[in-house]
């Protein structure tokens, strides 16, 4: 009941309460270089990342699948991975530079519930790039499993009104 009272008058443009900064979460993530480039813009978080690695595979863009070019895409990835291995033996620090935006890295991300609201508002919105949107939706789903009331109104800007109607039908 407390969270319903706290969120009763919230609007899509409102910041959530600062008290939610006391609720921390830690996520172990694997993501593409493209996704990481967007995620690291969220400064109210701690990100600890490993190097990109062919051993983590790649993220296949839906646009490549939509035009039926997965085979060609993966052939280029195979060539890239071969170049990576050649360079890695001579200059390990230079090898990651040959990898693509589709290659993945592991990331530990620590953030608080208030920042997760902010991340969800921007990155789970239908206008967000598909890769960061998918990652953000998975993070939000996992966090909601643990604290459903705390994150009851966390969603993309485009989904706020529908979510509000679910929890506050008379408002």
Model-derived regions, located:
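A conserved ligand/cofactor-binding region detector
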Residues: 1-171
